[in-house]
Every structure is written in C-alpha cells, then in structure tokens.
C-alpha cells in the first residue's frame, strides 16, 4: 500500500498536463479522477479541495463529469461532500447543475476512490 501511495503521489506531481486538474487514479469502470491542485487549502485543521470524476460516456442522467468539493480531516481520515457540480461535457466543461447538499462525515477505506484522493491531499499537508 505504501508503494501505491508513493506512486500516486509522484503521479500527482508529474501529471500536470490538464492545467490545474491533476490525474490521480482511474477506476475499473470508465472514470478517471482528478484533483484541482490550485483549490487545495487548509483551515482550522481541515483540508478543502475540488476533485472531479470524468467519464468516457454519459451516465444515466446524461452527465459526463462531476466535480466534488470536499472537506477532509487527515488525522481522523474522514471527509464530507460539500458541493457537487454535474456537467454534460467532459472535464467539467460547460454549464453544470449545482447541488450544495452537504453529506455527513464519511470514513473511506484507503483503497477506495475518495480514500485515495484524500490520501493524496493529506500527503501534501
């Protein structure tokens, strides 16, 4: 697991060909996940960041990509979804449908998609 995190962290640093969105991981399905490095901030013991799931084809609602705004707590390895933006175009382009419904705290497994994203952010802070 440690080797996987080191590999992912090195990818996080080197894959900056998407502008501010940095590719972190691909799922077994048809999604690629990114973190917006420019959005990272730490405040009062929490980390805040935007992440994105970019699909190869539209989902059942016609969305190609979804951006998520997270609040994370590295010490307890937990996070909340603070906002979602659903886009009909790839890489979050175009006008998106915004949902500001905040979730409860989630304790992801380190191997899950959101767990890997949180691990990458926590490695920076």
Predicted regions and their residues:
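N-terminal secretory-pathway/extracellular module detecting exported/lumenal segments
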Residues: 16-67, 73-125
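Sec-dependent N-terminal signal peptides
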Residues: 4-15
């Amino acid at each position: 697991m440690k080797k996987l995190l080191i590999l992912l962290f090195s990818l996080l640093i080197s894959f900056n060909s998407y502008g501010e969105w940095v590719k972190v991981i691909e799922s077994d399905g048809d999604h690629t996940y990114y973190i917006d490095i420019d959005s990272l901030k730490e405040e009062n013991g929490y980390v805040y960041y935007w992440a994105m799931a970019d699909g190869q084809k539209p989902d059942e609602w016609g969305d190609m990509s979804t951006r998520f705004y997270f609040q994370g707590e590295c010490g307890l390895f937990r996070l909340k979804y603070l906002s979602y933006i659903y886009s009909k175009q790839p890489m979050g382009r175009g006008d998106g449908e915004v949902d500001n419904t905040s979730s409860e705290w989630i304790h992801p497994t380190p191997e899950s998609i959101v767990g890997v994203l949180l691990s990458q952010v926590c490695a920076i802070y």
